[in-house]
Amino acid sequence: MSKRLLSLASLALLFGCAQQPNDRAQQYQQQTFPHILNRADVVESNKPRDYTEFSKQSELVVQGSASMAKIYRPLYEQLNEWVLQSGDPATLAQFGIQAAQLGGGDKQGNVLFTGYFSPVIELRHQPDSVFKYPVYGLPKCNKNCPTRAEIYQGALDGQGLELGYAENLIDPFIMEVQGSGFVHFGDDDTLEYFAYAGKNNKAYVSIGKVLIERGLVEREKMSLKAIKDWVLANDEATVRELLEENPSFVFFKPSAAAPVKGSAGIPLLPMASVAGDRSILPMGTPILAEVPLLNADGTWSGAHQLRLLIVLDTGGAVKQNHLDLYHGMGPRAGLEAGHYKHFGRVWKLGLENSPTQAPWALPPEKQQ
């Protein structure tokens, strides 16, 4: 994912029907959905609603991108009017708003929600006995960049690429997965934003998946917290061996502290923006989503909440029936985001007689 701070990601889909599990908020329909996007003449949802952040997020899009404003401003305006006058999804058509339901990986409408956040990690400008793990800027290696293991072994030493030094390996690793992040330099009390600068073009391997396959963390308990707990319980050599299972490495470029932005270049608001697959959800697309609500321990609360969200980011692991919900900045946001691997129903929205009309339409090669 483009402009995020330190991040994480990469999860798979679960399927179900009638008596199948619903512990991750799955819902089962009386019908199956044949396509990725399926025309919905009426949206039926009785979930509690919270549309409070949509107006602010849509305003940031209009202010920040003339091209997206040209396409989406009329739809945003109609959605804001709909929120003021009704907010009932069954009345969308009365405002000229069209909907297409995502079919879900199981063709039952269950769309996977994971979470991401903007971490703030502690760095120092110079290494010492504690802060000794470098965060790197982009090297001039083109397609012959070293692997993670080679970088850990010193392949980039002496090139002046060190942007700062962390107190462990896992914090920079998580920032790499997120794609960007905020850093706090404790030696001069400054806050900087480390934006994504590039990567070494090696294949990404999920360390969460490795931990599950090795039987070190149960699949049902996998989360960012579970990964960090495992890291804290093991020595540096063991942790390093695990991280080296992922040869991919992300490089950063520092900038003054700024609003967190996604790949669309628009500031992101927590619980109002998502990363999605731009082949079916172009940047700026508004969606109506039944977002699963979780308990503090990461289990599903038994409820969903209906929200208006805008797709403003992308990610290598975010494909088709998978959305990555932005949770905000800092440790609490990270804890909440790390719990998310649950399901909800999602509708892509469009406005009749506008560039966004017929949101169910896909190029023939993408129809499934």
Curated annotation (Swiss-Prot):
Pfam families: 3D, MltA. CDD domains: DPBB_MltA-like (cd22785), mlta_B (cd14668). Keywords: Cell outer membrane, Cell wall biogenesis/degradation, Lipoprotein, Lyase, Membrane, Palmitate, Signal. It is an enzyme of class 4 (lyase). A lipid is attached at residue 17 (N-palmitoyl cysteine). It catalyses: Exolytic cleavage of the (1->4)-beta-glycosidic linkage between N-acetylmuramic acid (MurNAc) and N-acetylglucosamine (GlcNAc) residues in peptidoglycan, from either the reducing or the non-reducing ends of the peptidoglycan chains, with concomitant formation of a 1,6-anhydrobond in the MurNAc residue. The keyword Lipoprotein applies. The keyword Lipoprotein applies. This is Membrane-bound lytic murein transglycosylase A. It comes from the Bacteria. Its EC number is 4.2.2.n1. Murein-degrading enzyme. May play a role in recycling of muropeptides during cell elongation and/or cell division. Degrades murein glycan strands and insoluble, high-molecular weight murein sacculi. A lipid is attached at residue 17 (S-diacylglycerol cysteine). It comes from Vibrio cholerae serotype O1 (strain ATCC 39315 / El Tor Inaba N16961). It is a lipid-anchor. It is found in: Cell outer membrane. GO terms for cellular component: cell outer membrane. SUPFAM superfamilies: Barwin-like endoglucanases (SSF50685). One of its GO terms (biological process) is peptidoglycan catabolic process. Disulfide bonds: none annotated. GO terms for molecular function: hydrolase activity, hydrolyzing O-glycosyl compounds; peptidoglycan lytic transglycosylase activity. Residues 1-16 form the signal peptide. NCBIfam families: PRK11162.1.
